[in-house]
Amino acid sequence: MNKKIFTILFMLFSFLCIPANAVNIKENNGVYHIVLKSNRKTLKKLKCISVQDLMTNREIHKKSKAVLTVNGGFFDPVNKKSVSYVYTDRGLVEDPIFNENLYKSGIVRKNMDKILNRTEFRILECFDGYKTEISAHKNPVDFECQLVSAVQAGPLIDPQLQLDEEFFVVKDEEGNIIRESASVLHRAPRTIIGLEGDKYIHFLIFTDNHPVTLEEASKYCAKLGIDRAMALDGGGSTSFNYKKKIEVVSTPEKNQGRALKSFIMLNK
């Protein structure tokens, strides 16, 4: 009996017993689950980046000779400008305030505060080491920490789903949804990043073979024990590359993924 219990516990916990610099990837029914250990060694090599001209996940992954590359924040494919804040090497490199296309729509202008305060993934260097957090953009960084890198997207999906708060849905006076962005209420490929305390960083890649709503993605995160999670750009942007071993793209264009603006990358 004791041997049987030990075997079950070993199977449950072996997935998260990974070396300090390892990338653990499992695929099940069209969902890729990527786990990184959130320690100094990993976080010094993990960064959020943007490119001047749009590039596919494959292109930037190959050019950077990265270990892991995952698609990042929102962008405008017409003017190739970011709709999300991006910080790289302790500096702001993308600011959606300067994306003139955001100001062409009256309803978007009216809700700019919500758009600019969407959720972001942060890497911080603090007095006691490197940390990660998922937070609204306007939430200040703790005074003992410095922002090293960040990418904004949204919405927050765990512990609560913030569709209205981050302007992904608009409701009329009776509470009926009259506008939807990023197909948040419909099933689509998704890229999710989540944090399990200060121990692990989780990426969930829901492929074309397993599209989900954000509510379904939220429940999936809860089952995995993820404490806090947010959506990155999804749909046709969903993509990731791992070394030269794995490539996942959504609705391939010319046998490669969509050209994108920003990425989360783990370097060698």
Regions found by a protein language model. Name each.
Residues N2-A20:
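Classical Sec-dependent N-terminal signal peptides that target proteins to the secretory pathway
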Residues I18-K268:
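Gly/Ser/Thr/Pro-rich low-complexity, intrinsically disordered segments
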